């Protein structure tokens, strides 16, 4: 079941305790909102999933809960059918009692690109902004994060996360809140803040950077991954309408422009640590995500261009430090 009370208990005696002045009212308002049309149906599925739980949890090199053969073949089929109610599964993959949830995105590939370049997460408070299904929260926990908090306003992602959490025994140090970054007060409490695949969806990228900064403690680390284009520090692509069929893409900076933005916002030790072209092996249709995917968003005769004629998706990871002077 969806439970926020356990998070309140966790943070009550932590450096996040001041969040309790505003958070319960926000989440009560979310729960009482009528905008989540499928939420009652998904909650009924979550109730049925309470029957399944395993003490086998591997978060070190994958997200694996339960093992093949731990439950009967019939129960495995029932579990798989229940999990299919949360289609489309976009971020993963997950391995649940031998069921391979082959998600649209190979989010493990992104994690493998990011992890070598960031500060160790052991004993850190971590915030993942726009966390989707919560896949990376589990990988962060697997790296020893003391507290991993994800925020994303999508009810479906919350239910996907809750399903995985329930199956693994409800880890008290991993939590998902259905909020956007703009709804958070300036907590200035997290050791590491991740924003991966969010910046280009924001109408004001500079405001987004400042919102991320407001969540970091002095000396904390920002890990930002976004779509980029080639060019100098003054190059920014603003799509006329859609980009790769997405109608909510606003600004795609060059790496040099992104570094300039981060420095302009007061970040220190700013660097690009990875650059990678997104391929149809990393983002594609699967049994668990049967809608259109990257292959349908590129020109059929030229995969280096989107269907609109823009450069095909290329992503970069930037790491920066919040200074202590502001």
Swiss-Prot record:
Family matches, as Pfam families: Methyltransf_9
InterPro entries on file? CmoB (IPR010017), Mo5U34_MeTrfas-like (IPR027555), SAM-dependent_MTases_sf (IPR029063)
Q: What domain of life does the UniProt record list for this protein's source?
A: Bacteria
Record GO biological process: tRNA wobble uridine modification
Tell whether tRNA processing is among the UniProt keywords: yes
Top EC group: transferase
Q: Does the keyword Transferase apply?
A: yes
The EC number on file is 2.5.1.-
The residues the record assigns to binding carboxy-S-adenosyl-L-methionine are: 91, 105, 110, 130, 196, 200, 315
GO molecular function terms attached to this record: transferase activity, transferring alkyl or aryl (other than methyl) groups
Its biological function?
Catalyzes carboxymethyl transfer from carboxy-S-adenosyl-L-methionine (Cx-SAM) to 5-hydroxyuridine (ho5U) to form 5-carboxymethoxyuridine (cmo5U) at position 34 in tRNAs.
Question: What family is this protein classified in?
Answer: Belongs to the class I-like SAM-binding methyltransferase superfamily. CmoB family.
Assembly and partners?
A: Homotetramer.
Q: Which PANTHER family match?
A: TRANS-ACONITATE 2-METHYLTRANSFERASE-RELATED (PTHR43861)
What name does the UniProt record give this protein?
Answer: tRNA U34 carboxymethyltransferase
């Amino acid at each position: 079941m969806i439970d926020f009370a356990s998070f309140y208990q966790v943070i009550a005696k932590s450096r996040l305790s001041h969040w309790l002045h505003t958070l319960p009212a926000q989440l009560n308002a979310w729960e009482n909102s009528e905008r989540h049309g499928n939420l009652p149906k998904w909650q009924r599925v979550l109730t049925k999933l309470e029957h399944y739980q395993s003490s086998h949890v591997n978060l070190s090199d994958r997200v694996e809960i339960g093992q093949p053969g731990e439950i009967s073949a019939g129960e495995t089929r029932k579990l798989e059918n229940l999990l299919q109610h949360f289609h489309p599964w976009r971020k993963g993959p997950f391995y649940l009692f031998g069921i391979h949830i082959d998600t649209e995105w190979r989010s493990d590939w992104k994690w493998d690109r990011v992890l070598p370049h960031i500060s160790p997460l052991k004993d850190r408070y971590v915030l993942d902004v726009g966390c989707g299904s919560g896949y990376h929260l589990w990988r962060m926990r697997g790296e020893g994060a003391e507290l991993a908090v994800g925020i994303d306003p999508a009810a479906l992602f919350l239910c996907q996360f809750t399903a995985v959490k329930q199956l693994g025994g409800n880890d008290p140090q991993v939590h998902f809140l259905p909020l956007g970054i703009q709804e958070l007060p300036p907590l200035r409490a997290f050791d590491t803040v991740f924003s991966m695949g969010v910046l280009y969806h924001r109408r004001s990228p500079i405001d987004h950077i400042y919102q991320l900064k407001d969540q970091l403690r002095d000396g904390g680390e920002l890990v930002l991954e976004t779509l980029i284009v080639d060019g100098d520090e003054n190059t920014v692509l603003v799509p006329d309408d859609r980009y790769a069929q997405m109608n909510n893409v606003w600004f795609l900076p060059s790496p040099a422009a992104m570094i300039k933005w981060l420095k302009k916002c007061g970040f220190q030790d700013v660097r690009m640590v990875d650059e990678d072209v997104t391929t149809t092996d990393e983002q594609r249709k699967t049994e668990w995500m049967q809608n259109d995917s990257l292959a349908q968003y590129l020109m059929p005769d030229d995969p280096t261009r989107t269907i609109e004629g823009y450069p095909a998706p290329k992503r970069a990871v930037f790491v920066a430090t919040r200074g202590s002077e502001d």
